[in-house]
């Protein structure tokens, strides 16, 4: 990872910026006087494309990013007027560190699930790295996630389209104890959520929470990691962050390299 792009910086005491879980890229942003970790992706301006299709006209309105850099264009997901908003889908990420099975919850985020399943079917996640591990455990900061879904492996990659945020799952999360107003949520261990670059900029990057994490309620929750998958996450987290690549030792490439060999529908 280079330091020329903007990056998600966690709110370590030494940092004057707030960490953001960025999808497609990373972006350090100031947040009043209290720096803290965040989750997101920052856009990278690029030459507009004239050959992109229009946005879909169904419930989710998947919208091509004409002015964004994307890594792998595989088209736009199906977008029915009435997508299924019940039940769950299983997806297994076959990684070099073990199988991580995730449960996608259509009741919480039907558009995120529709997009994720589409990308799985297209082989979008195959042979991609999980490029980022965060390990902020010092109070009052908390951000413990593995971030994946970028074919570039840099934090910049995306599928070439955006879709809107869905907050039903976020609203169901418990408030962080010090924030009873809900301005910070406890993205609890096992949560599966979308990274983003700001409101309504979901793409392909996602994060898996291996320990309770304090974040703004800005990241679409669309599922959970199964118990066997959590064991794999714990192994990755225990190895820590690869030293020497980033500004903070709590945030960077995982020391134990993680590569999604294949992503497929169904359980183990």
Residue ranges of each PLM-predicted region?
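Cyclophilin-like peptidyl-prolyl cis-trans isomerases
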Residues: 2-11, 18-268
């Amino acid at each position: 990872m280079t330091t020329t792009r903007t990056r998600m910086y966690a709110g370590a005491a030494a940092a004057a910026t707030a960490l953001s879980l960025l999808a497609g890229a990373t972006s350090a942003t100031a947040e009043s006087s209290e720096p803290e970790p965040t989750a997101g992706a920052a856009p990278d301006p690029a030459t507009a494309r004239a050959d992109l299709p229009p946005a879909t006209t169904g419930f989710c309105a998947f919208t091509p990013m004409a002015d964004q850099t994307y890594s792998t264009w595989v088209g736009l997901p199906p977008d029915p007027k009435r997508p299924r908003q019940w039940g769950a889908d299983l997806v297994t990420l076959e990684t070099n560190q073990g199988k991580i099975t995730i449960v996608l919850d259509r009741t919480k985020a039907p558009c995120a699930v529709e997009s994720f399943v589409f990308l799985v079917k297209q082989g979008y996640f195959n042979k991609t790295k999980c490029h980022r591990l965060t390990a902020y455990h010092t109070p009052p900061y908390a951000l413990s996630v593995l971030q994946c879904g970028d074919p570039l492996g840099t934090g910049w990659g995306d599928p070439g389209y955006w879709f809107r945020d869905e907050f039903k799952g976020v609203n169901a999360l418990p408030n962080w104890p010090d924030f009873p107003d809900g301005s910070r949520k406890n993205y609890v261990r096992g949560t599966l959520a979308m990274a983003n670059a700001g409101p309504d900029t979901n793409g392909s990057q996602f994060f898996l929470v291996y320990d309770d994490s304090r974040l703004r309620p800005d990241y679409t929750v669309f599922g959970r990691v199964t118990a066997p998958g959590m064991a794999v996450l714990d192994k990755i987290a225990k190895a820590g962050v690869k030293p020497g690549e980033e500004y903070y030792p709590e945030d960077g490439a995982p020391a134990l390299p993680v590569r999604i060999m294949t992503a497929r529908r169904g359980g183990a």
